[in-house]
């Protein structure tokens, strides 16, 4: 066994074509089939547990759960044999309880099943032509009863047992409705159909003997004990959205044109429409009963709830539930047109689950249906939108935990394997064949039937930004670095770059369709494999094959490489896994009777996983073993289409033809996860376009304004309500006060009455007590008397029993005496018999002795007779012996002769055997050659068949396109007429629109001008405000200075006034004046004024030096740039001169070739004149000239193309030079001048003429 273990972790998908495919295990857990498993899914906690199907199972057909929810029955086909497996759901993990697979009757498969109410019995229905209904006691694997359900082999859709009675059984089918009762080991029909039979699709028990039955014409019947009690017809109702869409479509066009992508012809389309009109009746595919009534499907996307009318035997429609339209669908009006195939209520009847024919699960809370009165309620997705067809593409990325899948249901989906959710999905008009996810997780490449599209993964959308005309691309893959991606077109590989989005390489070499691509780790090589049996390794730098391994007998399905890219692993149709290295097959590991469909290897190179055609996966350890050393796991219900490992080797991802996606956790044998440390966590960034952000910002603004408005409205409403409620409260308080007063009076009255009643009750109680005491005394007296009587009777009975005991003892003694007498008599009787038998025995012994004596005498006589006979025989054989000896001598001579002949013949035989061995070896060689040739023939036949198919497809496509063209030409006239009318209607509106647009542009210009003016004015205002603040500060400083000066002047005046008093005394006056000078005039002021002037001069000189230095550096930069531009210009001029020289040389060659052509043409004219004279010579010369002329013409075309390319290059370079000349500071060199292209063009045209 392998040491690699995979454990199923989560599944995205619902298995189709299973009867009763969803159940509730409890309020939170549901059970549904997915792949080759049944899944227990917790709705609240979002976990899944798996119940694996049987080994080598070919598919589940039907499910059934017991009423006590302990057992689950699964009908499946195991190794082409039907079987019913019953699991015990209460055990963890769920274990098999019983397997019903030994049958005494013919059975192909079980199509429907049901448990009895007590879960002891199981009812199963087999498929036609047997159509047996079997009633099992399943725990003992015993068939209790079996009956043929329908003698006409009509299909049976559903069987069930009554919800309260084990013995009542109901079956419904095409023209079949039977009620049966199990009694005395048989099933007997208790109802008989009257009138026309219908196609009964579903039924449900609503009570012990009542059944609701639905038909394909939208009718519901209620049967009670086989008699019809009620009937109704479901009316077709369309949702408002679909009606509005139809009205719009009718108003847009009176004639319906077929879509361009539809290959169906108009006649076939009419047939389809008639069929759809016939099938417009709502078909009742599912019915589920609950306590209030029942729910039933009523046509596409519609479920009706019926409730029982009280005290009557019929039901009325109470609610309608619809499947919502899917806005991500390519046709939202048709997305809700799904048939509901199964309905299921939770145990508390709080939730209803529905499954549809498009493999979707929907749920609804029943309380919501009661809230939505008048309008139809809508289902919600129980999980998320799932794939409804085969998944064809799978990929994952490095930077995010994302999985990308695409399917034949025309959808692309992005899943998150970390949170097990659906991130994005979108449906398209074309089928998607392959998908590849960029390592960053921001882009995907999808191959559609019409084109290859490169798309962005936005936050809520998948939006294409580049399309390539690669039709029907079945394989594509991003490189590990993400800078390249490869796409397959039939047998050709295109390599595109993600930077310039151009096709940089085309790899050709395969002769068949390419099935698989894989890049090596450094993206330098690409490995491809296809149906032609070829595995190629391409070198992308050269575009050539480096290694190749071709085995035409094998059609490869998948390929992968080891991490070091030295070994290639390939799987295909020959049931082997091949190890290829250096173009040689190193080993072939057998697949043991299955075909490997896909393969992947871990990034560590130690684990290999392969998917098989029967839906299983195998985990192997590398290096591989030739023995069965692998672990095999049940996975899908069909071939595994794709599989891969995540970048950290933690999870295995697989997709299948059944439309399911599995995620597996990978472990080693000890249960440890294979750890690869992530250096960086998963990225959380998403792509959002600028327009989306602006729209969302606008929406947010609008919503904010709306919220403000609503707040205002709510406040106003609240104030109104407060006023109303205060008034009501006042009214109620007044009312309640009045009522309280009235109640108080009533209470007083009642108290008085109560007191009266208490008095009367006391009197009555006293009377009753007296009466009871009297009765008790009477009873005691009676009981005493009865006791005395009973005691007397007891004594009498005791005496009787003593007497009877004495009698019985006497009888026992008598019996013992009689017994001993009887024993003595018997012994005497048997002793007499014994004596008689001994006498008889002695007589018999004497007879035996007499017989022995007689035997001895007869023996002697026989011996004597035998001796005589022996003597006679002896003489006879002696005579014969003599004769034989004579003949023996004669034969010895003959044998000598024959021995010589034998030796010669033996030599011949040895020679012949040697010849035969040589021929056998030649035959083996020839057989090997024949086998290889047969394999080649088969491969060629397959190739021819595939090419024929492609040719037929293309011819069919051409035919369909021709038909479409004819139809479109028919409708062209009508469309032209409509276009003219619409143009007439549109012209005035367009003029108005133009006028309005001009007005809007003018207004926008004015608005921009006003905005600019406003900004300029705001700037001016800020500048002025700053200036104002500065002037205010200066003004305050000046005012302060002014105040200081005024104070100084006042002080000076006072001091001067004091000095005036000494005017008559000069000496004192002089001293006072000197004191004033010293007080008011200071030397520091003078020094400060001089210092300020010197500082200003220094600052000015410093700034000047700085500006001069900057100017010098800028001059140097300008000179350097000019020199650089000059060198570039000289180089370009030199290139142009060389190119013009080449052109002139090519023109000279062209002129020579033309002159040669002219000479040859003149020679031809001469040869035409002399044709009649020399016919054969002229023919030869004509052939020669024709061949030379064709050669010359081809050369002429080639030279013309070269000249055209050179001319375009020269023009491009001239434009480049002009752009360079327009750059400021760039000057042309006066010495260099190019020859004019115009003159050369004129010369060229003259020569050509």
UniProtKB/Swiss-Prot annotation:
Domain of life: Eukaryota
SUPFAM superfamilies: Quinoprotein alcohol dehydrogenase-like, WD40 repeat-like
Pfam short name (any one): Beta-prop_EML_2
BP terms from Gene Ontology: axonemal dynein complex assembly; cilium organization; single fertilization; sperm flagellum assembly
Transmembrane region(s): none
InterPro entries tied to this protein: Beta-prop_EML-like_2nd, CFA-57, Quinoprotein_ADH-like_sf, WD40/YVTN_repeat-like_dom_sf, WD40_repeat_dom_sf, WD40_rpt
Coiled coil: 690-1056, 1094-1165
Cellular component GO terms held in the UniProt record: cytoplasm; cytoskeleton; sperm flagellum
UniProt xrefs under SMART domains: WD40
Tissue: Predominanly expressed in testis, lung and skin. Weak expression in brain and kidney.
Cellular localization per UniProt: Cytoplasm, Cytoskeleton, Cilium axoneme
WD repeats: 105-148, 195-233, 335-374, 386-425, 427-469, 471-506, 509-548, 635-674
Keyword list, A-Z: Cell projection, Coiled coil, Cytoplasm, Cytoskeleton, Repeat, WD repeat
Subunit structure comment from the entry: May form homodimers. Associates with components of the nexin-dynein regulatory complex (N-DRC) and the CFAP184:CFAP263 complex.
Summary of the function given for this chain in its UniProt record: Associates with components of the nexin-dynein regulatory complex (N-DRC), a key regulator of ciliary/flagellar motility, and might act as an inner dynein arm (IDA) hub or linkage.
Similarity comment: family membership: Belongs to the CFAP57 family.
The protein, known as: Cilia- and flagella-associated protein 57
UniProt gene name: Cfap57
